[in-house]
Amino acid sequence: MNRDKLISIINGFAKDGKVFSNEQDFQFELALALKNEVEVEQVKLEAASFPQGSWNLDDIRNGKPFSVDKVQKEYTDLIVKTTDGLYYAIELKFKGADKPYLYKSMAFGNVAVLKHGAEHFNAYRFLNDVSRLERINGRLFANDIRIEKGYAVLLTNNSKYKESDFGGSEIWREYSLRGGQKAKHGLLRIRNSEKKYLAFEPLNLNGYYTFEWNDYKLEPDAMLNDKIPGFSFLVVEVDPQEN
């Protein structure tokens, strides 16, 4: 499995006229499409992982009770196992614009995509997914697995993600996902010390990441009038660090 395969599947959704209403809708359809691929053996949704050393896998296999109440759990949207025994991790984001819009889906009729806005926060969260995928082989899953590649995916009808450099916000300037910019790498600063921003720790990316946006090419009549925005999507490939 590779980035081109994911792009092909998502392009197929557009060709079939699929309009998603939320992230869970998108996640389920992508999981189903991946499961139907010849080279895919299994797909796990919302796979939990824990810090190394939080519990002993052999003890659990032998029936020893364990608790995860006080350890930092993380959930990966999709873990894909291919027929050659390799594992891949996918993190998804589906983000609406700053107002709700109604679309026509070939499969379900009218579909409402509600507003999200907050592009700065959500761009941070997308890059945090990239950071988590870099570190994923330092996590402990219920099965002793090693992730071969990670993929961070964003599908949106908000053009600010692909066009804005966040130039009006010194706080989030380094978190723009705009295409064509210099590769993201290293420490990404958050230029504010206000209390409401303290929950957002600066990210430090090991890899170098550029953002190649793709149009999600629905038929023109999917947009009920010319004021309704189209969709675009981003697939970023991540090499997990060895631990």
What are these model-predicted stretches?
Residues 35-71, 77-79:
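A short acidic/basic microdomain associated with nuclease active sites
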Residues 71, 76-92, 97:
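Active-site beta-strand-loop-beta-strand hairpin of nuclease catalytic cores
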Residues 19-29, 42-47, 143-150:
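Short glycine-rich, low-complexity/disordered patches
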Residues 70-73, 226-228:
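A short catalytic or substrate-binding loop motif that flags glycine-/basic-rich loops and adjacent residues
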Residues 144-147, 151, 155-243:
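Non-catalytic C-terminal interaction segments of nucleic acid-processing enzymes
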Residues 21, 25, 29, 73, ...:
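Short, well-structured alpha-helical interface segments that form or flank functional binding sites
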Residues 94-161:
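Catalytic cores of nucleic-acid endonucleases
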Residues 1-39:
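Interdomain/boundary linker segments immediately adjacent to catalytic/signaling cores
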